[in-house]
Amino acid sequence: MSSNKINKKSIARIAAVQAIYQNILQNNDDMDDIMQNVLSFYQNNNAITDLPENLKISLSISHFKMLVKSVFENIHKLDEIIDNHLTNDKDPAHMPILLRALLRVSICELLFCPTTPAKVVINEYTDIANDMLNEHEIGFVNSVLDKIAKEHTRLI
């Protein structure tokens, strides 16, 4: 039986969203503690019980750590960017936590990881959003990332 693998960077992106979600939910600013909790979960293959037997999950630890550290270092700038993309009738304080976590990580990778093409970042996080968010939020993620990618390329 052949074993299937999911891209290690894709798993790192999901794990980074989980770490930032944990940061927001628990109001925990101990980045090392958060990263260790998430890494422990992924390193314990028995913790993920609803996967097919032949599916192997492992993440790029370096990409995960880079994403989480970059979000922590740029959190205020990221939140400002997110809030600037909200329509006037939306209150930033009422944004769902998971949506904010996903946007923080995705915008961070889009702006601060120039080695990853914008199209890849947009596709990856739209796929992640498809598994985690409702239809309206998925469209919002795609729209915001697309706008930021276009704005960013004009600045280069």
Curated annotation (Swiss-Prot):
One of its GO terms (cellular component) is cytosol. It comes from the Bacteria. GO terms for biological process: DNA-templated transcription termination; transcription antitermination. It holds the Pfam family NusB. Keywords: RNA-binding, Transcription, Transcription antitermination, Transcription regulation. GO terms for molecular function: RNA binding. Gene3D superfamilies: NusB-like. NCBIfam families: nusB (TIGR01951). Belongs to the NusB family. PANTHER family: ANTITERMINATION NUSB DOMAIN-CONTAINING PROTEIN, N UTILIZATION SUBSTANCE PROTEIN B-RELATED. Involved in transcription antitermination. Required for transcription of ribosomal RNA (rRNA) genes. Binds specifically to the boxA antiterminator sequence of the ribosomal RNA (rrn) operons. HAMAP family: NusB (MF_00073). This is Transcription antitermination protein NusB. It comes from Rickettsia conorii (strain ATCC VR-613 / Malish 7). The gene is nusB.
